[in-house]
């Protein structure tokens, strides 16, 4: 049966103490509301209605989605009022799944289970059992059918002993939902329209009300402050670490690993402590990642070793390469098979050929380095004149002496040698030696300055 989703995302989130709408705060590097949208997309929803209010411009600038229906809740008058804003876009003959925008860890299989329950009843609720349900609305059942939700303050002692509580997430037919929304009243202490009132309406009509439950209570936990946000962040990281280790990745300390995107791994990958993975990252077989590294939108091929404290962003590291420690590969950096980048080397829009080496203290920008070339310590490609970027080409088997400056655009031929300390401004032919530095002058018996 066709189904639509209503995501409630209009709240300001006052306790977050932020200018950012609550649902745009990130968990695992992704805004909370975007995580929920991604989940229901994978579930196969026909339509998604996003109810927004506070920070609408920020939401629209961040959540760029096709086929997303934006429903403005100009005044925040309760959850029932929020769903009413989406009602004109809901069809009678479809089921409607209602979710909250600040519970980002809900799993696809949990929502699939809720959908399956709805197929055999009129109203399906997502409930959860808590060890301490104090302050929460209790689920009341009669012959296994849910008949009511009783708020904690109104519950009897027997009802307060019930551990099952309502999460606010539910599914019903469009026709039932719209009818019940039209009957909601704000005759309560808060003067708001509560979505949970539809449960009592359904029960009074003799509707069959059933429930599904998540694998873990953390799936339905919401965020109202920074502490809760941090707790959900850690819960997500623990979940992701468990999945990686189950799939064969060695995490030397799972509690000190952060995945803020997607990570594809081969066999026998080893990741040391304090590694952060952002965006889309792929690691081949037998890759080793040292401590304190940041990997962002990059690909690292089989048998590569990334030493500690290195940063790799939008770069490609070839098979059996070595990077670091303390190296930085910036966007457009490419290392081919068996290449090596050592400590305090930076690459940007540069290709380091097969077997080539830049072992220390080097900047390679807008450069192409041939196979088996050796780049000495302190070498700089001077690629920027203040307006334009220019390219440096270094041929295979070339040797660049330490502390050389290569002023682009410039070409160093195959097998050429550049003497240490040179400033190269023009082409160096194949197999030639280029030396371009000031002549040394020695002054005998030089009197050193003395302090007065």
Swiss-Prot record:
Swiss-Prot/TrEMBL catalytic activity: alpha-D-glucosamine 1-phosphate + acetyl-CoA = N-acetyl-alpha-D-glucosamine 1-phosphate + CoA + H(+); N-acetyl-alpha-D-glucosamine 1-phosphate + UTP + H(+) = UDP-N-acetyl-alpha-D-glucosamine + diphosphate
Cofactor: Mg(2+)
Any one cellular-component term (Gene Ontology): membrane
Any matching Pfam family: NTP_transf_3
Annotated spans, Pyrophosphorylase: 1-226
EC class of the enzyme, as a word: transferase
Keywords from the named record: Acyltransferase, Cell shape, Cell wall biogenesis/degradation, Cytoplasm, Magnesium, Metal-binding, Multifunctional enzyme, Nucleotidyltransferase, Peptidoglycan synthesis, Repeat, Transferase
PROSITE patterns in alphabetical order: HEXAPEP_TRANSFERASES (PS00101)
Residues that hold Mg(2+) according to the record: 102, 224
Region feature (N-acetyltransferase): 248-452
NCBIfam families: glmU, PRK14353.1
Protein name per the record: Bifunctional protein GlmU
Source organism (scientific name): Alteromonas mediterranea (strain DSM 17117 / CIP 110805 / LMG 28347 / Deep ecotype)
Lineage of source species: Bacteria, Pseudomonadati, Pseudomonadota, Gammaproteobacteria, Alteromonadales
Gene giving rise to this polypeptide: glmU
């Amino acid at each position: 049966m066709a189904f639509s989703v209503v995501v409630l995302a209009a709240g300001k989130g006052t306790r977050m103490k932020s200018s950012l709408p609550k649902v745009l705060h990130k968990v695992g590097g992704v805004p909370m509301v975007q995580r929920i949208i991604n989940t229901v997309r994978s579930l196969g929803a026909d339509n998604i209605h996003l109810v927004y209010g506070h920070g609408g411009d920020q939401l629209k600038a961040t959540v760029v989605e096709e086929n997303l229906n934006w429903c403005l809740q100009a005044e925040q008058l309760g959850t029932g009022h929020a769903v009413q804003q989406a009602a004109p876009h809901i069809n009678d003959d479809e089921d409607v799944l209602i979710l909250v925008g600040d519970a980002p860890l809900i799993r696809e299989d949990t929502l699939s289970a809720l959908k399956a329950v709805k197929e055999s009843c009129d109203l399906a609720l997502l409930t959860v059992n808590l060890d301490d349900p104090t302050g929460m609305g209790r689920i009341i059942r009669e012959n296994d059918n849910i008949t009511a939700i009783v708020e904690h303050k109104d519950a009897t002692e027997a009802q307060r002993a019930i551990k099952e509580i309502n999460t606010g997430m539910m599914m019903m037919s469009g026709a039932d939902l719209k009818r019940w929304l039209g009957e909601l009243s704000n005759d309560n202490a808060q003067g708001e329209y509560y979505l949970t009132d539809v449960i009592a309406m359904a029960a009074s009509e003799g509707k069959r009300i059933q429930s599904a439950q998540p694998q873990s209570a953390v799936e339905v936990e919401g965020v109202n402050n920074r502490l809760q946000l941090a707790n959900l962040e850690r819960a997500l990281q623990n979940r992701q670490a468990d999945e990686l280790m189950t799939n064969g990745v060695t995490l030397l300390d799972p509690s000190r690993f952060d995945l803020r995107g997607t990570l594809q791994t081969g066999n026998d990958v080893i990741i040391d402590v304090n590694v952060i993975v952002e965006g889309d990252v792929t690691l081949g077989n037998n890759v080793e990642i040292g401590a304190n590294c940041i990997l962002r939108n990059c690909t690292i091929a089989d048998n590569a070793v990334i030493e500690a404290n290195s940063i790799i962003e939008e770069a490609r590291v070839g098979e059996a390469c070595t990077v670091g420690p303390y190296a930085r590969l910036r966007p457009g950096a490419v290392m081919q098979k068996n290449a090596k980048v050592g400590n305090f080397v930076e690459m940007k829009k540069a290709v380091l050929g097969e077997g080539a080496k830049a072992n220390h203290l080097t900047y390679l920008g807008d450069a192409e380095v041939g196979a088996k070339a050796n780049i000495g310590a302190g070498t700089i490609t001077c690629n920027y004149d203040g307006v334009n970027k220019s390219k440096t080409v270094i041929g295979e088997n070339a040797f660049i002496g330490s502390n050389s400056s290569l002023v682009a655009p410039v070409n160093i031929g195959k097998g050429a040698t550049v003497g240490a300390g040179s400033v190269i401004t023009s082409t160096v032919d194949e197999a030639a030696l280029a030396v371009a530095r000031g002549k040394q002058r020695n002054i005998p018996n030089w009197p050193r300055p003395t302090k007065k």
